[in-house]
């Protein structure tokens, strides 16, 4: 991720990791890479979850990890996102975070039917 550097607010990284060279080489993007500007950043940590505070006090929260639906079954995954939502609402985030639970059956409810992969 690239963020503005012109002082319009403050980005605070929450979740940062360094993608493998395999990821940088492009099979996980659409349209499929590789892309030179992505490969040029090999070894560079990437921010995947962040908070943002505007100069006027407004808050934002971003996360690039919502692509795999079953990840929502992970308690810590949900907790991080729920904590971010509570924080942007300027409510108090509990010391141990927002607790929630979801079953596999609940995760599978109301999913759109998928066609065959080509």
Spans of features found by a protein language model:
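Phosphate-centric recognition/catalysis
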Residues: 63
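Cell-envelope and extracellular/periplasmic
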Residues: 66, 89-92
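Short amphipathic C-terminal alpha-helix that caps PH/PH-like domains
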Residues: 77-88
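Short conserved micro-motifs at the rims of enzyme active sites and ligand-binding pockets
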Residues: 24-27, 72-76
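Extracellular low-complexity, Gly/Ser/Thr-rich intrinsically disordered linkers
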Residues: 58-59, 73
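Long alpha-helical segments found as membrane-embedded helices
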Residues: 54-58, 92-118
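Active-site rim elements
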Residues: 35-39, 66-75
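Catalytic beta-strand/loop cores that center a nucleophilic Ser/Cys/Thr
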Residues: 1-56
């Amino acid at each position: 991720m690239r963020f503005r550097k012109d002082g319009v607010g403050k980005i605070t990284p929450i979740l940062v990791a360094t993608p493998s060279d395999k990821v940088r080489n492009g099979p996980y993007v659409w349209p499929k890479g590789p892309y030179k500007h992505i490969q040029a950043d090999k070894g560079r940590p990437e921010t995947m979850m962040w908070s943002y505070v505007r100069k006027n006090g407004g808050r934002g929260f971003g996360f690039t990890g919502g692509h795999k639906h079953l990840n929502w079954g992970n308690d810590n995954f949900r907790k991080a996102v729920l904590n971010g939502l509570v924080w942007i609402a300027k409510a108090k985030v509990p010391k141990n975070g927002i607790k929630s639970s979801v079953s596999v059956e609940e995760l599978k409810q109301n999913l759109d039917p998928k066609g065959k992969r080509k």
